[in-house]
Amino acid sequence: MDSGGPSTFAFQAEVKQLLHLMVHSLYSEREIFLRELISNASDANDRLRFESLARPEWGSTDPELRILVTVDPERRTLSVTDNGIGMSREEVIENLGTIARSGTGEFLEKLTGDQRKDAQLIGQFGVGFYSAFIVADEVTVLSRRADAPADRGVSWISDGRGEYRIETVERQQRGTTVQLKLKENAGEFLEPERLKALIRKYSDHIAFPVRLAGSGHEEETVNRAKALWARPRAEIKDDEYVEFYKALAHDADGPLIWSHNRVEGKREYTSLLYVPATAPFDLWNREAPKGVKLYVQRVFITDQAAQFLPLYLRFIRGVVDSTELALNVSRELLQQDEAIGAMRTALTRRVLDMLERLAEDSTKYATFWSQFGALLKEGLIEDLANRDRLAKLMRFNTTKTASDEQSRSLEQYLGDAKPDQDAIYFLVAESPTAARNSPHLEAFKERGIEVVLLTDRLDEWVMQHLTEHGGKPFKDVRRGMLELDAAKGAEPKAEKQDRERQALLKRVKQVLRERVDEVRVGGRLRQSAACLVLNEHDLGYQMRELLSAAGHKPPAAIPSLELNPEHALVRRLDAESDPARFERLALLLFEQAVLAEGRQLDDPAAFVARLNELLTDLGTQGAK
């Protein structure tokens, strides 16, 4: 590490790119710099308050935590000062000269060109400090850690063009000051009334007093300095809830719904939970930071309190403020606290209550489902206690939906079911198009029986856990024998045809050998000649791919081939006496069935050759 004297460093390459984008692409949203600097100051105060639990001496001098915004019109400077945790020289270099590698690429890829949305991404990716260069020709940072002596302060100065200068300086005050030398066209941010309006707009909920001083203006507290969630619900307007969410989640869009509750009695805590309208960039990274912000007796503990909600609800944003949890609990020990389990159960129930209310508005719920529906399905696997409630929240694409949108509920399915229907039928496929065109649906379409179409990556795994609903079992239309037309006490039509076609079935089995478990006649097909059928307990194609992707070898599973004896190709096959032509046609029927499943052929070239031979034969016969 450098000695402590004046040193000049070059910004990390990603920082240079980021600074260029901010200065040139976010001009119309430049006021957000103040939101970001005050938010950073609030975080620094929060961290000092937490560290002071174990080290009271850190906050013993100057114990009143606050944020001061100062303007000097003559020097054209605006400063944001906190008396929080502060930074060491090493931390300043690490925090202000580089961006965490994990978020840099994603941030740059997510930029849309929409200045309003991109301005929100700044905070979401933890790069809010750099927004200061949108309005400043030069930025100076003065800081001293709470545990450092006065002669170990640090000064950081940059014009944002590629380099920054850093040196160790004398600083009596704990905490950090960010001073901006404003550009000529940024004079509005020297006006007290403009700054008051911005502070109230973006930082009214900050739990520390935000004070404004300078320009002959007497120092005054501008914000309410009381956490929004700590106020009575009756006093809070909807737009206040929305603005708080936007600041909390760094989201340009408002939430779909929220729930604000105070629990009293044996366990006392307040929760304010939000359902976003759009998914965050790292939604599918189960290892990414997640969870609600946790406060204990108004003391900030962590903004990644994942213990309070199950993983499938990781999209929820919000705050939990408890008086129950021990104040000296560490972030690591928090998950061992016996009160956590009870709070997790109650908060999960609260979220499901919210989603049930949201489902009453089909338009809003469609928005929610398009963003988070696949995630909610994880709950069917992980949350046995709430599986029935979650099942009612599911939405599906079915043979009755006009588009490929997942909009049908299981309650709607059961309400429209045939009087004699004894199961909820479903089909797993690679895509909505493949599902709708599947030969497995032909008998169901003829009878007007609705089939749920499942095309999400986890659907087959989910259906191993969701086995019944409303007293009816789920049945996979790709598995086992299926006979929709059999009258009670009568021999199923497919079984009768199976007996009558035994000679044909044996001949086809001899050709296909180990490719299929069995060749039979079934009740599924009407227009198609053949289809593949899974055995009842074999893993489906989706599950096999998931296991393979995870590095596991799936157990062997050999499908059966089901033929439609009424189809012209099957009749021709039955009448074919030439062994070579019979083998070629039997293989073609099998390969067509594989393709209809959306699967890949082992030898596409051989399939093309057989198809060409068949077409040539047909052409020759037609010419005679």
Please place each PLM-identified region on the residue numbering.
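GHKL/Bergerat-fold ATPase module in large chromosome/replication-associated machines
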Residues: L121, V139-E163, K183-G187, E193-K624
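GHKL (Bergerat-fold) ATPase N-terminal catalytic module, capturing the glycine-rich phosphate-binding loop
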Residues: M1-F189, A197, K418
